[in-house]
Amino acid sequence: LGDGSIKWAQWLAAEGGDEAQADGMLAAEAVRLLEREYEKPFFISVGFHKPHDPFVAPKEYFDLYPPNEVQLNQDPQDRSPLSRYALPDSYDRFRSFNDQDRREFKRAYHACTSFVDAQVGKLLDVLDRKHLWDNTIVVLLGDHGYHLGEHGWWNKVTVFDIGARVPLVMWVPGREGMGAETETVVELLDLYPTLVGLAGLEPPHALQGKSLGPVLSEPMVDWEKPAFTQVLRSNVGMGYSVRLGNWRFTQWGKDGSGGLELNDVIRDKEGYYNHADDPKHSDRRERLFGLLKQRFPTISRAAVHESVSGNK
């Protein structure tokens, strides 16, 4: 894709079936394991690689997405200027992409996602065949989000909600509320104490995570727990971000000298509009900074911080 300088930005609609690919082989082995051991108590973790680059999947999954039907993202003209460290230093590398490159990239990403979806389905089919749904907990999750052209970026490693938010789907037998969706903000740190509790065990003390049991029982439960994300940037160090309810606040650098961001992630999930310098949101900004300070005690606030325009 592009001028070829981005070695990982490659795609291939491969000949052959699912098991010609590593994730297809993994799914087949996991199916064999389940069918052999299903009568015993089991814990099975299956980590698929896709939709990670390089974007290779069997051709049948690419055929689901005709190139001329792929819609490209258009950043709004009135968006706020980006904070200097909002994107990695390699931001300019995608300037060589033309519209055809962008369509092929997005198509390949979706094809790889559909490919993995089919592999997950093979595992769930075993639960059907062996009648395991009544005593098996199932968790489907990812490890990060992804940009598909938003802010001109085609990768991960951001703290925008589209970069930090992950899929998380759970099935717990015997629980009311299964099949419901929730906008409750949780962390992957919460998964361990949740599974320990569902297994009837006592979780260790001093865990940072919190059991999601109340959310599983009542998806609309009042849950005011912040979720934290960090990402490393050269020169400024760490970016610290907190999501609480509908809002995300980010501070670049320990003293905030790299910039501040405040986004309404429900109305603006891509993070196009920065409200950090808006006096109407100063109380919200300071409250969220206070949560960051509790979680990361070494951070502070510089007397003068970089505005969204990059000027001091």
What are these regions (language model features)?
Residues 1-28, 32-185, 198-201, 205-206, ...:
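Active-site-proximal cap/lid insertion segments
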Residues 12-14, 235, 271-274:
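Short, local alpha-helical segments
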Residues 28, 273, 286:
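Alpha-helical elements of the RecA-like P-loop NTPase motor core of helicases
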Residues 144-150, 156, 189-192, 197-265, ...:
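C-terminal cap/loop subdomain of S1 sulfatases and analogous C-terminal strand-loop tails that border
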Residues 174-177, 268-272:
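A short, flexible beta-alpha/helix-coil linker loop
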